[in-house]
Amino acid sequence: MKKHFLSYISVLLLALLLGCEKDTGTSGSSPVCFYLSPEPSTRATDTEFEKGDAIGVFAAARDDESVPAQLRPSGNFADNKKYIFDGEKFVPDGESNSIFITSYPIDYYAYYPYATVDNPLEFTFHVAADQESLTESDLMYARNTDGSGKNNIPLTF
């Protein structure tokens, strides 16, 4: 009887161990969003983001918790994820652009306006020939290097 009981317990424990998988941190968690904080001090007009404006976001994991991360040409924690302004904050443009928090420090680098960028270290920006929409020619960037593991990350452009 004891043999059967021990065999049963062993099989049950083995099944439990085989059923475990590594947690990636994305299951059931909300993606990171970005909000503007504080508003920049400027004399320029038309300086607010409008609903639908898009930014590109790169995220880099820190090797050393006390030193901000450096972007690499590719293979960062997140490479050029597109985030859209919803009137209050920047949210991912679809699930494939979502960035999820992790247990290790992440630094965020953002730019406006969104463009296709393969290598953040060789970013080329061209001023629009048609100046009808001046904001499309306003290159701005922001970064957050506090290594926060929060869902709402402040950015100052």
Where are the model-predicted features located?
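Short, low-hydrophobicity acidic/polar segments
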Residues: 26-157
